[in-house]
């Protein structure tokens, strides 16, 4: 039986490092819409929804034919935002994919390959690359501390 897969794109206007980052434009199109349009090319996602904290984002999303759900400004991170957004959807999905809203160049084939990898390797819950030494002190890159079995202990900047 085919698994139902939902892509959720968390985005918020109150970015600390770059003010109103989702609204910044590349070739006249907001960054989060570029991300949405690229993710929409996935061959595996059954649905794709933007989870956001501001009506401005909802209105822009509608102009591009994107689905969007308003979430609380109190969400501490993207994971909380997609969880809150998912609770508002009246559909069941087998898998939920977190697609960061500031990835305008995301390759839809990579989305599909990560989903396929996870379906084949059911114990994997987070799939990510290793970090380069020169990026250890960079606050723009999330770091993961894992145990000897590769299980995530915590995430930090």
What are these regions (language model features)?
Residues 1-4, 120:
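Short, Lys/Arg-enriched, disordered terminal segments
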Residues 106-157:
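Conserved core of the sugar-phosphate nucleotidyltransferase
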Residues 4-52:
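N-terminal glycine-rich phosphate-binding loop and ensuing alpha1 helix
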Residues 10, 98-100, 129-130:
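Short beta-strand segments
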Residues 49, 55-116:
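Short phosphate-binding loop-to-helix
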Residues 13-15, 101-104, 133:
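Short glycine-rich anion-binding loops that position phosphate/pyrophosphate groups of nucleotides
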Residues 7, 48-50, 96, 127, ...:
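Hydrophobic/aromatic residues located in beta-strands of well-ordered beta-sheets
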Residues 45, 91-93, 121-124:
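Short, high-confidence coil segments that cap the C-terminus of an alpha-helix
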